[in-house]
């Protein structure tokens, strides 16, 4: 059995396949090449959990993976989902390393997860899971060690419980232990919208390269959580036509553009985009609608070889993590679709988290405009660097982004040397 067999999963295989192709292309030293395929730390924990309505005790499994410790503290979200596994968490931690390096953040990548479906949990049940999971992570997390944040199935309330649990163990308030927490506890006022607005900023930078204008574009958004809804709002505010969106409840379409502020009001009342008066319900595949910009902002693996040929977008901006499979990626490139990869396109979230962490550690809050301006500057500068790498090496943007991220992480590893 090889070392990598410990982290077996389809997502891990895809991440390593991409990594192997890029490291072969840049001729990365074979010693460091093998080391970066594996995390430096991978913690598996089990703990008891009792539901509200009966006394039977369940055993819950959780993970925290830290990929690289050479860049600074590690950073990455915590997800709650029934299908969470070590391979998936490891793959996501590796991607966080590349993502942080691409936008110039002083972090290594990390990721955590609990294998439990959060949907049926009461608030008290979710709190018990969170506090016990946090207690199990105490040896490996810390303000200068590893800083969690929200992800699938977790939110700012989850982060508040983690902060409170950790602070009680340490004996003093520790707001910097997590990011993505409520503003009342030192959370960033822009964190919730940062990923979505960052996606649009990156898309706008790409359109500039093509001598196109965002305000003249049509936009389709798959997924209407935080990323999708703020990408939609920013697109609307820039004058683009958002012609289709969807969520778990259904999809809507209006060729003349959807009024996004009015859609927000509809969602507040009806909990879904479906049946919005300003658009038609839509039953066909939303990813295949003809548009200028397609933003997949839901889950991974939605663009695959079976539907890639049918995609009619000019530009795809990956708001979700790993929405495009490797096989689909090649088909899209061959068809002339410009694809901006997740490790660049959705880096607004981790960038805003970094700003939150800096403010917490300095006990000094920045104003909203300063946060927004810094976010856009970081993301557009990173895009410019990746574009130059792409042009220079005649490679697609995903490969160019990986070249930038992997080279930076490898350089830090090699410069620090071996211990002992």
Task: Place the predicted regions along the sequence by residue.
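Short, Gly/Pro- and small/polar-rich lid/capping loops
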Residues: 3-46
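Glycine-rich, N-terminal phosphate-binding loop and its surrounding beta-alpha-beta segment
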Residues: 45-118
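Glycine/serine-rich phosphate-binding loop and adjoining beta1-alpha1 elements at the start
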Residues: 81, 100-215
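Glycine-rich phosphate/diphosphate-binding loop of Rossmann-like nucleotide-binding domains
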Residues: 179-182, 187-290
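Rossmann-like adenosine-cofactor binding region
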Residues: 250-339
């Amino acid at each position: 059995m090889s070392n990598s067999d410990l982290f077996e999963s389809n997502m891990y295989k895809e991440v390593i396949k991409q990594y192997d192709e890029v490291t072969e292309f840049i001729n990365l030293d074979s010693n460091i090449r093998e080391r970066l395929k594996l995390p430096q730390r991978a913690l598996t924990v089990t703990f008891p959990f009792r539901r509200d309505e009966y006394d039977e005790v369940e055993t819950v499994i959780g993970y925290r993976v830290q990929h690289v410790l050479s860049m600074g503290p590690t950073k990455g979200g915590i997800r709650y989902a029934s299908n969470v596994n070590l391979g998936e968490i490891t793959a996501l931690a590796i991607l966080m390393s590349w993502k942080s390096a691409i936008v110039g953040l002083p972090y290594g990548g990390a990721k955590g997860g609990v294998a439990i479906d959060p949907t049926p949990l009461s608030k008290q049940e979710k709190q018990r899971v969170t506090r016990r999971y946090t207690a199990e992570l105490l040896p490996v997390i810390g303000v200068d060690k590893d800083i969690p944040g929200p992800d699938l199935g977790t939110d700012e309330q989850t982060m508040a419980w983690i902060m409170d649990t950790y602070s009680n163990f340490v004996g003093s308030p520790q707001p910097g232990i997590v990011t993505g927490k409520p503003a009342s506890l030192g959370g960033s006022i822009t964190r919730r919208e940062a990923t979505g607005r960052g996606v649009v900023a990156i898309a706008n930078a790409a359109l500039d390269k093509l001598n196109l204008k965002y305000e003249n574009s049509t936009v389709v958004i798959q997924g209407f959580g935080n990323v999708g809804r703020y990408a939609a709002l920013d697109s609307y505010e820039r004058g683009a036509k958002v012609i289709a969106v969807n969520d778990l409840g259904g999809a809507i379409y209006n060729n003349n553009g959807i009024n996004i502020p009015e859609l927000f009001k509809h969602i507040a009342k009806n909990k879904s985009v479906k049946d919005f008066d300003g658009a038609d319900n839509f039953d066909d595949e939303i990813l295949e609608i003809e548009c200028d910009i397609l933003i997949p902002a839901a889950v991974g693996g939605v663009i695959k070889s079976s539907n890639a040929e049918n995609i009619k977008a000019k530009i795809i901006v990956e708001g979700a993590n790993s929405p495009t499979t490797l096989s689909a990626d090649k088909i899209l490139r061959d068809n002339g679709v410009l694809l901006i990869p997740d490790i660049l396109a959705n880096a607004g979230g981790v960038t805003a988290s970094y700003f939150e962490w800096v403010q917490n550690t300095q006990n000094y809050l920045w104003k909203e405009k300063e946060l927004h301006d810094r976010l856009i500057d970081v993301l557009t500068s990173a895009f410019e660097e990746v574009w130059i790498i792409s042009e220079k090496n005649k490679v697609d943007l995903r490969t160019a982004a990986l070249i930038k991220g992997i080279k930076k992480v490898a350089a830090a590893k090699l410069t620090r040397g071996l211990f002992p």
